Amino acid sequence: MATPHISAAPGDFADVVLMPGDPLRARYISDRFLEGAREVTSVRNMLGFTGTFRGRRVSVMGHGMGVPSISIYATELIKTYGVRVIIRVGSCGALSTDVKVREVIVATGAGTDSNVNRMRLMGHDFAAVADFTLARRAMEAAERRNKPVRAGPVFTSDLFYHPQEQLNATLARMGVLAVEMEVAGLYGVAAESGARALGLLTVSDHIITGESLTPQERQTTFDEMIELALDVAHAEPTP
C-alpha cells in the first residue's frame, strides 16, 4: 500500500535501505553498485531503487534535507514497508582540527538543536545513538578495506546557515566531530519504531579551517563510504 510520499508496492523495498540526502545520489548508487536494480518510487522526485549487492537484496532511497524530511521517509519505510535497517550515507562539516576532509565518520550518537526527540519524550532529553552492531560492522569493514574512519558523536542542526557561530567551538570542546542535518532525527525514528539505524558521513568541508573537497574528491570519497555501507548491509542476516 502506497503512502502519501512513497508510491512503492508492498515488498518493493528490501529490509535494509541506504539513504543519501540527494535523490540523484540514490540513482547513482543504484546504477553503480547494485545489480538488477529497478526504480520502486518517484513521488516528488524522491527516487528509490531496489537491487542486489553480492546477492543480498538492498534498497536505496533519497531522504531530502533536514530532520523533518528524513523522519517522514524513515517512518513510512519502517511502518508501511517493513524496513528494519536504515543507513544514512551523507556529508558533514568537521568541527575538530583532528578530523580531516575525506575522512568517514561513523556517527555513534547525535546531539541536536531540533526539538523532535524532546517531543517524543515529553520534554526530556533522548540519547540518540546508533545501533551498536551496525556501527561495529562499519568499523570492521573499514579495517578490512584499510580505510581510515572515525567513530564518535556528531551534531544535527535544523539550520544550515546557523546564527550562533560560537556554538561550533563549544561542540568541538565537547568532542563532537562534525555537524550535519539528519542523524539525530533518524536515530529517534528508529528507536521509536523498533528499527535500527546508522549514520555514515563523509567529511566534505572543514568548518574550522575552511578546507573543502573538490567535486572529483567528493565523488571518490563518497564511493568509499558507500562501499562501507554496503558491506554493513550485506552482513545483515536476511529475515
Swiss-Prot record:
Extract the CDD domains matched here.
PNP_EcPNPI-like
Q: Residues that bind a purine D-ribonucleoside, according to the entry?
A: H5, E180, M181, E182, S204, D205
The first-level EC class reads transferase
Q: Which residues bind phosphate?
A: G21, R25, R44, R88, V89, G90, S91
Question: Reaction(s) catalyzed by this protein?
Answer: a purine D-ribonucleoside + phosphate = a purine nucleobase + alpha-D-ribose 1-phosphate; a purine 2'-deoxy-D-ribonucleoside + phosphate = a purine nucleobase + 2-deoxy-alpha-D-ribose 1-phosphate
Subunit comment: Homohexamer; trimer of homodimers.
The record's function comment reads:
Catalyzes the reversible phosphorolytic breakdown of the N-glycosidic bond in the beta-(deoxy)ribonucleoside molecules, with the formation of the corresponding free purine bases and pentose-1-phosphate.
Tell me the protein's name.
Purine nucleoside phosphorylase DeoD-type
Organism the protein comes from: Myxococcus xanthus (strain DK1622)
